[in-house]
C-alpha cells in the first residue's frame, strides 16, 4: 500500500495502473481487490464475497491495487533504472560465496560461461526463490509441510467464459470454487487481462501430465457451464509449505520465497516478500551507515519469521483445514437446511481481512504488548509494533506525506522541550531522525498518543502519552542498543 508511495514508486505505480489498466483497459472488468467463494460451481446458487481488501482501505494511506506481476516487475525495473548506485547483471548466474568476520565474497558467472566476476560486500541477501542456492550454500535448513498434492496451473483464453462470469461477477477479480471431492483444496481462478485471459489451478492426479489433464473439462465443471478455451500455458507445482529455520547466517540473509513458501492462496505471497525487503533494508542501511548493530540485524529474523509462521497457521493452512471440515460435514444434497445454515455462518467475509494485521508487538526493538505475528485487529489507535494509521492534519496534508526516510518522531505541537531532547539524543547516537510537531486534528486524536516513534518501515517503535519518557532510551531501544523502555 504505502510502500510505492514512500519509496519513490508511487507516481510510477499509479501511472501504470492508470495507463495499463484504465486507459489500455487491460483488466477492465476487475473490481480492485474483490473475490468470491462458491460451492459446487461458480455459477451455482451458493457464493459469497471474499477477501475484499478495500474493507480496510481507511487504515492505510493508499488503497489496495491488484497489479499484475508483469506490471509490478515493470514498475520495479523502472525505479531501479533511476538509481545510480544499483547495477543489474542480466544473463548472469550466482554460483557461490565465502564469508569471514569482515566481509563476504560473492561469485557470479555469465550464463554463456565466458566470464566470471567476484564481488566483495558487507552482506549478501538471497532473494532467489523457493529452491534458493544462497540458502542451500549458507547451510540454512528449512521445515517442509508436504501436502502431497500435485497442482495444475494453466493460463487460458476464453471470451465465452469471460462473458458468463461477467454476467454475475463483473466487479470480481478472483474466485475460489469449493468441491466436496477435493477435501478443502481449491479450484482457484482469476483474471489476467482484458483479452479474456485467466489463470486457473487445482489439484490433479499425482501422475498428471500436460497430455493427460483435460483443462477444458476441469474449467467447465468448476464454472458450471460449457465453453471453449484456448490454452496459453500449462504447468505443475507441488502444494507444500516451506519455512527456513532462520533468515540469517552470518553475513547472509534470505528473503521472499527463499525464506518461506506457501500455496498461492489468498494473495499473501508477493506482499510477504515486499515486507521482508522493507523490514531488512533499513536495518542493513543502519549497519552500513554506522548507527545499527548486530542485534538490530537479528531482529529481521525475529520479526519476519513470526509473521510468516502466523500467516501460515492462522490464515492459509487454516483456510484449507476449515474448508475440508465444512465439505466433510455439510452437503446440500444430503441436508439442504443444515448446509445453508452453515454456509450463511461462513459468509462473514470481513473477518479474515480485518484480522490479518502483520505486527511486531513482541519484538525487542519496540515497546509493544504481546507477541509478533499476523493476527490483529485494525484500528486507528497508535500501538507499538503495529503499522501507523494515516491521519489528515489541520492543514489538509496527510501524515504519510511528511514522514522521513528514516525514523520519524511525531509529537504534540506543544512538546517543544521533548522535540529538542529527541534531536539531541539522535545526534549523540548518530541516528537520522525527523521530528514532526503536529496539532491535534480530529484524525490525529484517533492515535490516542502524543509521542509516536515511527520506524523507516512505517511500523511504530513507541507510542504513548508519557511526556516524561526518555527520548534517549526510546531511540536506543528502537535500534537494538537496549531492551524495552519501561
Task: State the predicted function of each range.
Residues 1, 6, 10-338:
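Core Rossmann-like FAD-binding/catalytic domain of the broad FAD-dependent monooxygenase superfamily
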Amino acid at each position: 500500500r504505502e510502500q510505492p508511495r514512500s519509496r519513490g514508486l508511487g507516481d510510477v505505480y499509479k501511472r501504470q495502473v492508470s495507463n495499463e489498466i484504465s486507459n489500455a483497459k487491460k483488466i477492465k472488468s476487475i473490481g480492485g481487490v474483490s473475490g468470491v467463494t462458491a460451492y459446487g460451481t461458480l455459477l451455482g446458487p451458493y457464493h459469497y464475497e471474499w477477501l475484499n481488501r478495500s474493507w480496510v482501505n481507511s487504515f492505510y494511506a493508499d488503497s489496495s491495487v491488484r497489479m499484475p506481476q508483469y506490471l509490478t516487475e515493470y514498475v520495479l525495473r523502472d525505479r531501479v533504472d533511476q538509481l545510480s548506485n544499483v547495477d543489474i547483471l542480466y544473463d548472469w548466474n550466482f554460483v557461490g560465496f565465502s564469508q569471514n568476520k569482515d566481509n563476504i565474497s560473492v561469485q557470479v558467472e555469465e550464463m554463456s560461461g565466458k566470464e566470471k566476476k567476484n564481488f566483495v560486500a558487507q552482506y549478501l541477501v538471497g532473494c532467489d526463490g523457493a529452491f534458493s542456492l544462497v540458502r542451500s550454500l549458507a547451510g540454512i535448513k528449512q521445515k517442509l509441510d508436504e501436502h502431497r498434492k500435485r497442482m495444475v496451473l494453466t493460463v487460458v483464453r476464453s471470451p465465452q467464459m469471460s462473458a458468463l462470469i461477467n454476467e454475475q461477477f463483473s466487479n470480481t477479480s478472483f474466485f475460489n470454487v469449493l468441491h466436496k471431492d477435493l477435501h478443502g483444496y481449491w479450484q482457484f481462478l482469476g483474471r489476467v487481462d482484458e483479452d479474456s485471459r485467466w489463470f486457473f489451478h487445482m489439484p490433479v492426479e499425482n501422475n498428471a501430465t500436460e497430455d493427460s489433464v483435460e483443462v477444458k473439462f476441469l474449467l467447465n465443471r468448476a464454472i458450471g457451464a460449457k465453453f471453449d478455451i484456448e490454452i496459453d500455458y500449462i504447468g505443475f507445482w507441488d502444494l507444500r509449505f516451506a519455512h527456513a529455520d532462520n533468515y540469517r547466517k552470518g553475513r547472509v540473509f534470505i528473503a521472499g520465497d527463499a525464506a518461506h513458501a506457501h500455496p498461492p492462496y489468498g494473495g499473501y505471497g508477493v506482499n510477504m516478500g515486499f515486507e521482508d525487503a522493507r523490514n531488512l533494508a533499513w536495518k542493513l542501511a543502519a549497519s552500513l551507515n554506522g548507527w545499527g548493530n548486530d542485534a538490530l540485524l537479528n531482529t529481521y529474523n525475529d520479526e519476519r519469521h513470526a509473521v510468516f509462521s502466523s500467516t501460515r497457521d492462522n490464515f492459509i493452512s487454516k483456510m484449507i483445514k476449515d474448508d475440508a471440515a465444512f465439505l466433510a460435514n455439510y452437503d446440500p444434497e444430503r441436508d439442504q437446511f443444515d448446509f445453508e445454515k452453515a454456509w450463511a455462518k461462513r459468509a462473514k467475509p470481513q473477518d479474515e481481512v480485518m484480522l490479518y494485521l502483520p505486527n511486531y508487538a513482541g519484538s525487542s526493538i519496540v515497546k509493544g504488548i504481546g507477541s509478533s505475528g499476523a493476527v490483529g485487529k485494525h484500528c486507528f489507535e497508535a500501538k507499538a509494533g503495529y503499522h501507523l494509521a494515516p491521519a489528515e492534519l489541520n492543514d489538509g496534508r496527510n501524515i504519510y506525506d511528511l514522514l522521513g526516510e528514516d525514523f520519524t518522531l511525531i509529537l504534540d505541537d506543544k512538546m517543544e522541550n521533548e522535540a529538542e531532547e529527541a534531536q539531541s539524543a539522535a545526534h549523540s547516537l548518530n541516528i537520522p531522525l525527523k521530528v514532526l510537531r503536529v496539532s491535534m486534528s480530529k484524525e490525529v486524536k484517533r492515535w490516542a498518543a502524543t509521542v509516536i516513534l515511527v520506524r523507516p518501515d512505517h511500523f511504530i517503535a513507541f507510542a504513548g502519552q508519557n511526556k516524561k519518557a526518555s527520548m534517549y532510551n526510546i531511540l536506543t531501544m528502537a535500534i537494538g542498543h537496549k531492551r524495552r523502555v519501561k
